[in-house]
C-alpha cells in the first residue's frame, strides 16, 4: 500500500514540480540552472510580506515589516501543513534525494525539538519516504514536546544520541548499511538546500518590484546552521538587493567564530556551482559590508530562553498575535527591539524574516501519545528535563 501511495504522491509532485519549474524566481532568471537542478514544489510560495504596525509604533519604527515564512506550509483540504524556513530548503533537498539518488529513506540531524527535523519528517512523509531523525538533548519546553509528538504523528523514526561524535558514527554506519538512504545535514544547510534561500532572495526582489515593500535597509534573521544567511546573501547579490543582512546568532559564544567562516564557505561553494551551470550567474566577491553578525542574544547554551527573547515572544503575541519561539525567531525580534531602543531604526525600512511556524498542531495528537516515543524522549514529558518557561 505504501509503495502505491508513494507512486501516486511522487507523480503528483512531478506534475506540480514541472509547472513550478517555470515559475520559481531563480529559474526564471537563470533558465539553464533549471535543466540541472531538481526541484519539487512543497510549500506555499511566495510567502506574503506585511507591516508590523503595532509593534513598529511601539518601537518608533514606522516601516517595520515581516516576511511570513511561518506560512510556507502546503495547504491541503483539511488544514495547512507545518511550515517555516526549512520548507524552502527541502524543495531542493528532497528533489535531489528522489531524482538523483532514488532515495527511500531520509536521514537528518537535530536537537530533540528541532524544527528542521520535524519539517523533514513531514515532507518526506508527504512524498512517501521514510524519515530517520538522529536527535540530541536540549532544554525542555512546550515547543520541544509539541514537535516530538508531531514527529511521531508523521511516522518518523526517532533516535537519541548523547553527542555529535556518537551520532556521526551511527549515521556513517547507517548510510553504509541502509538501502537508498539519503543524508540531509543539520538545518539542511549544504550547497543543495541553501538554493532555497537563493531563490527566496529573488522572491523578495519580485515583491520589492511590485511595491509590496521598499527595498529594506535592514533584514533581520536568526542563524544556526548558516544556510539561510548564505543563501540570502548570495541571492541578494544576484538580484541586486543592497540591504544589510543582520544575522542574530543563536549558538553560545564559543561557537561564534565559526559562523562567518561557514557563511563564506557556503556562499562561495554555491556561487561557483551556479556559475558553472549558467555563466550568466556571475561570480561575486563576498559582501562583508552587507553582513552584520549580532552576537548579543546567543544565551549560555542552545535552546536556553534568555530574558530578551521571552520579552520578544510576549510583545509579538500582544501586538501582532504572531507566535515566535525562544531558540531562534524571538532572538531576531529581540535584536530589532534593542536596535530600535537606541534610535538606530528611525527612518529605516526594516524586514523581520520570520523563520518559525507558530501554528498549533496539537489537535493532531493526544498528550499521552508520548508513551509511544522511544524511552529517551518520553523523559521530556515526565519531568526528567529542566523546563524552559515562557516559550
Give a label for each model feature:
Residues 1-5:
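Positively charged n-region of N-terminal signal peptides that target proteins for export
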Residues 7-17:
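Bacterial N-terminal signal peptides
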Residues 21-391:
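PLP-dependent amino-acid enzyme catalytic core
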Amino acid at each position: 500500500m505504501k509503495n502505491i501511495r508513494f507512486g501516486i504522491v511522487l507523480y503528483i509532485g512531478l506534475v506540480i514540480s514541472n509547472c513550478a519549474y517555470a515559475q520559481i524566481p531563480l529559474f526564471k532568471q537563470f533558465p539553464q540552472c533549471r535543466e540541472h537542478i531538481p526541484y519539487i514544489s512543497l510549500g506555499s510560495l511566495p510567502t506574503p510580506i506585511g507591516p508590523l504596525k503595532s509593534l513598529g509604533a511601539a518601537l518608533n519604527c514606522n516601516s517595520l515589516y515581516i516576511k511570513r515564512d511561518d506560512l510556507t506550509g502546503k495547504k491541503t483540504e483539511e488544514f495547512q501543513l507545518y511550515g517555516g524556513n526549512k520548507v524552502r530548503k527541502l524543495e531542493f533537498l528532497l528533489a535531489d534525494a528522489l531524482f538523483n539518488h532514488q532515495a527511500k529513506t531520509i536521514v537528518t540531524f537535530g536537537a530533540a525539538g528541532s524544527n528542521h527535523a520535524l519539517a523533514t519528517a513531514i515532507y518526506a512523509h508527504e512524498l512517501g519516504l521514510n524519515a530517520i531523525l538522529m536527535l540530541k538533548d536540549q532544554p525542555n519546553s512546550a515547543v520541544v514536546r509539541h514537535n516530538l509528538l508531531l514527529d511521531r504523528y508523521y511516522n518518523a523514526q526517532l533516535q537519541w544520541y548523547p553527542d555529535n561524535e556518537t551520532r556521526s558514527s551511527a549515521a556513517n554506519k547507517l548510510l553504509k548499511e541502509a538501502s537508498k538512504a539519503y543524508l540531509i545535514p543539520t538545518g539542511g544547510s549544504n550547497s543543495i538546500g541553501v538554493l532555497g534561500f537563493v531563490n527566496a532572495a529573488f522572491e523578495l526582489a519580485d515583491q520589492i518590484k511590485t511595491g509590496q515593500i521598499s527595498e529594506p535597509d535592514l533584514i533581520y534573521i536568526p542563524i544556526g546552521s548558516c544556510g539561510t544567511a548564505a543563501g540570502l546573501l548570495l541571492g541578494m547579490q544576484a538580484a541586486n538587493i543592497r540591504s544589510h543582512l543582520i544575522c542574530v546568532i543563536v549558538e553560545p559564544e564559543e561557537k561564534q567564530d565559526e559562523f562567518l567562516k561557514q557563511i563564506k564557505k557556503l556562499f562561495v561553494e554555491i556561487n561557483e556551482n551556479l556559475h558553472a551551470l549558467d555563466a550568466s550567474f556571475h561570480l561575486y566577491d563576498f559582501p562583508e559590508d552587507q553582513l552584520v553578525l549580532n552576537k548579543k542574544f546567543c544565551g549560555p547554551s542552545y535552546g536556553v530562553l534568555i530574558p530578551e527573547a521571552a520579552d520578544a515572544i510576549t510583545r509579538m503575541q500582544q501586538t501582532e498575535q504572531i507566535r515566535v519561539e525562544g531558540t531562534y525567531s524571538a532572538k531576531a525580534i529581540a535584536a530589532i527591539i534593542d536596535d530600535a531602543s537606541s534610535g538606530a531604526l528611525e527612518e529605516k525600512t526594516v524586514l523581520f524574516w520570520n523563520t518559525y511556524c507558530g501554528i498549533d498542531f496539537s489537535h493532531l495528537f493526544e498528550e499521552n501519545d508520548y508513551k509511544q516515543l522511544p524511552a529517551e524522549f518520553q523523559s521530556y514529558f515526565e519531568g526528567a528535563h529542566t523546563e524552559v518557561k515562557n516559550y
